[in-house]
Every structure is written in structure tokens, then in C-alpha cells.
Amino acid sequence: MTAQPIRTRRLDLVPVTGEILSADLGDHKRLSRLLEAEVPAAWPPAEMNHEVLSEFYRMETEKTDPLFACWYWVLDEPGAAGRVLVGSGGTGSAISDQKTVLIGYSVLDAFQNRGYATEAVQGMIPVIFSHTRISRIMATTFPELKASIRVLEKTGFACTGPTLAGDGLEEGTLGFVLERGAWETHLPASGSRPRDS
């Protein structure tokens, strides 16, 4: 999947490149220049540790997953002091189903509970479903992560219950699914649009 720039009401979703991920792994000044945004000292979010970033870099540069795409979320709110990196989100292939894509996201603690994740996921969904072979988007989250559950519910995902060991998903998580047909029937008003390159 080729990520394209996405603009929502308050966010620029910047597609990652090998260069961006390389900078994130060791040179936040360069990352700041590449994103044209401040990179907070607390970056990256806890879920995006060095191991995860290294795997993203490998998938991006080696093109091992045809459904891998990732965006860095830059807050670019009119009237704000400047652009700030606040989170990220991306997609990857489901192990057992070529028509399902997995979605994940994370936001820095200082920027949580402001609606950024909901806004970004709403912006990502039309881009994901623009790939006609994708019929389902799946996400997982832990039951105690209430804010993450709210993001999924607000963006139209339905809870499918606890995930099972052996499905390639983390045991103890809840599964959520957004079917293309349900999304097309109830298109969310995200205000997002792919940006011309």
C-alpha cells in the first residue's frame, strides 16, 4: 500500500519513508527537519520502541509487506505556535486474510484525549478503502485502554470480542472490525482528503 499525504482539520498525516524512519531511530533533529515540525522530547510514544521502529524501517525499505503503510501525525492547527509531531498510525497485512488490513496507532501522552487519534484514523480509513481489494480493517487493543476503544467506536469499528491465541494477534486484546460495506453505508464526516503530490 502506498501511503499518501492526508490533511485533516488539524493534522498533516505525513507518509513515512526510509529516511524518516532512519532519522527517528537516531537523529531527532533530522527528523524535525524532514517533518518540518517540532519533535517533542518525549517522542516516540511508548508503543513505538526501538524494536518496533526498526521493524517499520525494515518493512518500509525491504517492501516485505504489501499492505504496510505508516503516517506520522503532525499537529498543524490554524493559529497554533507551530507544527508538532503528536502521534503515528499505520497498516499491515493480516496473517490469514489478504482482504483484511490491520491498523494501529499511538499518540504521545501529552496529546491524548484531544481527539487527534479519532481525527487521524478517520482520515486514514478512506485511503485504506481506496484499495479495492481491501474489504475489512481490523484493530486490536487491550480492554483497559478505554481511550483507544473510544477511538475505534467513534470511527465505526465494531467489537468482535477477545482475540484468540494463534490468530497472530496479541492474546488478551479485544478485536475490532470495520467492514467496507458498513463504512460505505455510514461514511464518517472526517473532513480529510488525500493531498495532491
What residue ranges belong to the model's regions?
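Conserved GNAT acetyl-CoA-binding A-motif
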Residues: 131-140
